[in-house]
Structure formats: C-alpha cells, structure tokens
Amino acid sequence: FLLSIYIAFSKYGDIVLGEKGEKPRYSFFVWGSMMFTCGLAADILFYSFSEWVMYASDPHIKEMGSIQQWAGVYPLFHWSLIPWSFYLVLAVAFGFMLHVRKRNRQKYSEACRPLLGKYTDKWPGRIIDLLAVFALLAGTATTFSVATPLMATIIQDLFHLTVSRTAINIVILIITCIVYTYSLLHGFKGISRLANLCIYFFFGLLAFVLLFGGQARYIIETGLNSLGTMVENFIGLSTFTDPLRSTNFPQNWTIYYWAYWMVWCVAAPFFIGSISKGRTVRQTILGGYVFGVGSTLISFIVLGNYSMGLQMHGIADFMAQYAKTGDLYGMIVDIIK
C-alpha cells in the first residue's frame, strides 16, 4: 500500500501508460466498472452479507471487544486497501510494459525479462508461466466455489426447484462460460458493456437495501464507526500475527486473504493495465483506489450492516442459525428475504 502511494505521488506518477498526449479510451465510470468487476465482484455479494457472522463467533473478536464494534471492521480491512494495492502496483507495471515498452505478450515471464534476459524464453520463463497458470486455476476454482453455490441456492429457493443444487451449479457454470465467451468475442467493448450492466444492477441493489431495508440509520452510523476504527487501527491490524497462536485469527483469515489476492495477481493486474492505456500512473493508482476501494467499502457497509442490523435489533438470529446449520448460503437467502 505504501509503495503504491509513493509511486503515485513521485515523479513516476506523471508517466503516461501509452504515447505522450494519448487520451484514455474509456470514461472514468466505464473504466472503474471494468476494473471493479474484474477485481472483486464475483465474491463480494457472498462475503458482504455473511463475513461478519463468521467473525462474530471467533475468539479474537471477543478478545478485542464487542461484536458491534469489531465484526464489521475486519471485512473492510481485508477487502479494501491491501488487496487493491496488490492489484494496482502490478497494474501500472504491466501497463507500462504493454503500452510504453510495447511488449504485448501478457505473460509473467515477460514481466521478468529485465531480470531473466535470454532465459525468459527458456525453462525458467516457462516455469514462471506454469506457476502463474496453476495460481489462476486455483483462484478461479475458489471464486466459483464461493459464488456459484450461492446463486444456485437463490435460484432454487426463488423458483421452488426440486432439482439438486449440483445440477443448478452446472447450468450456472455453462451460462457463465457462454456469457464470458460472448464478451471475449466482442473484445473490450463487450466486456465494458457487461461490466456496466453488472455495476448498475449492483448499485441498484445497494440503493434498494439502504432505502427500503429498514436499517438505514444503523447502516450509516455503524458503517462510519467501522470505517473510522479500521483507519485508526490499520497498522496494528496489518501487523498482528498472533505469535502465541491463541486464536490463529491472522493465519485463518488475514494471511488467507493475502494469499488469495496474490493468486489473482496473475490475472487482474494485466487486465487493469490493459484498459488503463492513456492514463497516467497516478490516475491509475488513485482512480483504482477511488472506484475499487470505494465500491468495495460501500458494499460491505450497506449489505454487511444491513444483515448485522437485523441481528442486533432482534429481527433475526443469523449467528444462531449459522452455529446450528453451518450453511452460509441458506443464511444469505434468509437475509435477502
């Protein structure tokens, strides 16, 4: 994170990712929509609603204080500045490689050419690319394993389907592949249209929950409190390692998330760098924080505090439901209802 801020405000921040005087291909909104949907969108509905529930029963949260004070802080910490700093630092590096150096081979080995030299095209470069492919497969599998069952559960409950959840999962994956292929065949234009559609639906959902969910005051006040607590304790949260392993919280959550974001660094930064042609390094980094981090924070503040508000006001008991069944997908469906 500190490295990204240094790059943005140093002399390197004025470097244009492209030819001198070249203008961005996309408007800020379209560019931000594409960046956000490529970075976090697949998992964000799942974790926005439910992550605080998983934290609420963790001994570390009880050590720190109340559920009200801390259960909503860690989602903001885990999903905001640090993951986006991973993406954005690499995005400007790849953007420089693609648009300034004109090296159009989007491979990790190509990014290592200044270090590997002639060995980039030999077995060291191939090993790097192979590891990147395995990392991408692991990240994709993790994302689909979280997002697809949730969609299947919602569809099954909404339409009262009697077929198995596995069959619905397969259908969803097939439809996803078709939509993805269609978008790719139409290039970045197709991807931008799909991203715009997704972002309109997404912010429409947030507006609906905030305005008509009955928890608006709680959402805003708790959200501001959690955001302030996260900013105030950012360094401590970032460096906590639980050396005595009293709860294993950073190992189970913080380090897991960092590893997950690093896995997606084999793909997301290449895409962000590709669509950032014509923007300066500073615009790419700060714009990424404004749109990427801003949208992420709003999502967790609205959706997470909506479900936590229902819990705190005695309207529902999601903590007891999760402790009894362990079914986060069914719990999220009940939250949405």
Q: What label would you give each PLM region?
A:
Residues F1-I67, S85, A207, L211:
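N-terminal alpha-helical transmembrane segments of multi-pass membrane transport
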Residues F159-L185, G204, W258-F270:
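Transmembrane alpha-helical segments of multi-pass small-molecule transport proteins
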Residues G18-T37, W70-I82, Q106-A138, H160-T162, ...:
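Transmembrane-helix boundary/entry motifs in multi-pass membrane transporters
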Residues L2-K11, E51, A141-L158, F203-T241, ...:
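Hydrophobic alpha-helical segments and their helix-loop junctions in multi-pass secondary transporters
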Residues V30-C38, Y87-A91, K122-A138, I170-C177, ...:
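Select transmembrane alpha-helical segments in multipass membrane proteins
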Residues I5-K23, G72-W79, A93-N104, T153-F159, ...:
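Membrane-water interface regions at transmembrane-helix termini and the short interhelical loops
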Residues E232-T247, G304-K337:
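Membrane-interface interhelical connector segments
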